[in-house]
UniProtKB/Swiss-Prot annotation:
Any Gene Ontology CC annotation: cytosol
GO molecular function: 4 iron, 4 sulfur cluster binding; metal ion binding; N6-isopentenyladenosine methylthiotransferase activity
Domain MTTase N-terminal per the UniProt entry, residue ranges: 66-184
Ligand binding ([4Fe-4S] cluster 1): 75, 111, 145
Protein name: tRNA-2-methylthio-N(6)-dimethylallyladenosine synthase
A Pfam family per the record: Radical_SAM
SUPFAM superfamilies, A to Z: Radical SAM enzymes (SSF102114)
Gene source species: Bacillus thuringiensis (strain Al Hakam)
Biased composition (Basic and acidic residues): 16-25
Intracellular or extracellular location(s): Cytoplasm
Keyword NAD assigned: no
């Protein structure tokens, strides 16, 4: 996925001297591979907040005359990490390019959540091999979640020796030093921290747009669902301080941003790691209601941590939108237990009831895995019935993909692939059926739309999203891009709505 990149003016200093933690070993070696065994450990070391970072003198104009290209795979967190890396490149003097042919540095920011994502990365590395032959000075790097996996790093070292550098999710702020090492080293530079570092504030960012922004509020996950690699690749749960988050969002609002999405691997576990204050996501959202910005969203939430206080705050409305993404993964209590989700079908349905009671117009979406090891026909039917009972607007659906190093990867799987595909097909048919039924209800309604830009399919048509995250296409002047407008829905499709402009623009109170 290409990134639209703009100039940024700040930079991170990698001086990371610690009173209680010593990471000097990472700086002395250009080969520090990952360890899933170490990544699984959850120590009680204090997580510090580092705020005083600047560009060291040795890196001034380091990238002048050079260009960088970043290809991003996976979730919004990866997209946001790319914004940070683009900021670091820019502060070093590099310029962005949207072509690997023109680049002096190519980074692949990777996703490890499913095998298909990893296959795409290795396919791209194969394409880059010929480019490296034509341009031996080109630096090729692999970063992100795949880099945190031992098997991936071993495969890169053995079969992709044209890769110059590998680094992970915990040491993005070390990019200037990694670039320097890769530029002068004859060997592949591997600097992957198996244990997470501190929370680094004031990192530079080159945001993808000036209408919507992502803001990390926490990092990592401690849930250890049996199928999931994320707790290993992203480390333990670490929350940013609320004052830093609020300051960042106020700054974005002052610069004209209309919508903020709060990010975290398990966003509603926010604040559970604080030892000095009792402060959770509900408290943060309550404070963000007072910020002069049109919309606040968050993703991704875990049903286990979705508490009553958060529901109460979301029910107050205002700039807190009515869309909640609440991954269920399965409708079977037995499957949920094997997945180590730590909730039951009944608990999930009760949570949905509470949400709908507090927010009558709430739109719920979800994630579902089919074909988990030993899933029976009856257990799959429970997923189908739960989907109908909740009445989700849509879902991201997947066939289970084993991840090396996770408990589920060791489970015996007696579900044939043709059965898994048939179940996915049936589930998707239900998802599509309910999606069009839900969208049909919007016909004739007037909805608030934040205009993102031109439609991908027709430059003469504008496109934007409602508060409930419905895509709306309509004809209007391009001067309305970035504005909130009223649109009357005239037609409904499975994944989008068509409409006509009624009123422009809406003032945010």
């Amino acid at each position: 996925m290409n990134e639209q990149q703009r100039l940024a003016s700040q930079q991170v200093n990698s001086s990371t001297k610690k009173e209680e933690k010593d990471y000097s070993k990472y700086f002395e070696s250009v080969y520090q591979p990952p360890s899933l065994k170490d990544a699984k450990k959850r120590g009680k070391e204090e997580v510090k907040i580092e705020r005083d970072f600047g560009l060291p003198e040795e890196f001034r104009n380091f990238g002048t005359g050079r260009k960088f290209y970043i290809r991003t795979y996976g979730c919004q967190m990866n997209e946001h990490d790319t914004e940070v890396m683009a900021g670091i490149f820019t502060a070093l003097g590099y310029e962005p390019t949207f072509s690997t042919e023109d680049a002096d540095v190519v980074l692949l920011n990777t996703c490890a959540i499913r095998e298909n994502a990893e296959n795409k990365v290795f396919g791209e590395l194969g394409h880059l091999k010929s480019l490296k032959r034509r341009n031996p000075d080109l630096l090729i790097g692999v970063c992100g979640c795949m880099s945190q996996e031992e098997s991936v790093v071993n495969k890169i070292m053995q079969k992709n020796q044209h890769v110059d550098m590998v680094f992970g999710t915990h040491n993005i702020h070390r990019l200037p030093y990694i670039l320097k090492d890769a530029m002068f080293s004859k060997e592949t530079v591997v600097e992957v921290w198996s244990k997470e570092g501190d929370v680094i504030e004031n990192l530079p960012k080159v945001r993808r747009g000036d209408i919507k922004a992502w803001v990390n509020i926490m990092y990592g996950c401690d849930k250890f669902c049996t199928y999931c690699i994320v707790p290993y690749t992203r480390g333990k749960e670490r929350s940013r301080r609320p004052e830093d988050i609020i300051q960042e969002i106020r700054h974005l609002a002052a610069n004209g941003y209309k919508e903020i999405t709060l990010l975290g691997q398990n966003v509603n576990a926010y604040g559970k790691d604080f030892e000095d204050i009792e402060y959770g996501l509900g408290d943060l959202m309550d404070e963000l209601r007072k910020v002069d910005i049109a919309r606040i969203r968050f993703t991704t939430s875990h049903p286990r941590d979705f508490d009553d206080h958060l529901i109460e705050v979301l029910g107050k409305g205002g700039n807190l939108v009515e869309h909640i993404h609440l991954p269920v993964q399965s409708g079977s209590t037995e499957m949920l237990k094997i997945m180590a989700r730590k909730y039951s079908r009944e608990h999930y349905l009760e949570l949905v009831r509470k949400i709908k009671e507090a927010i009558p117009n709430a739109v719920l979406t979800t994630d579902i895995i089919v074909g988990f090891p030993n899933e029976t026909d009856e257990q799959f039917e429970e997923t189908m019935s739960l989907y109908r009972e909740v009445g989700f607007d849509t879902a991201f659906t997947f066939i289970y993909s084993p991840r090396e190093g996770t408990p589920a990867a060791k489970m015996k799987d007696n579900v044939p692939m043709e059965v898994k595909k048939e179940r996915l097909q049936r589930l998707n048919a239900l998802v599509n059926k309910l999606a069009i039924e839900k969208n049909d209800r919007y016909k004739g309604q007037i909805v608030e739309v934040l205009v993102d830009g031109e439609s991908k399919n027709n430059p003469e048509v504008l496109a934007g999203y409602t508060r409930t995250n419905k895509l709306v296409n309509f004809v209007a002047p391009k001067s309305l891009i970035g504005q909130l407008v009223k649109v009357k829905v005239t037609d409904a499709k499975t994944w989008s709505l068509n409409g006509e402009l009624v009123e422009e623009p809406i003032e945010v109170e």
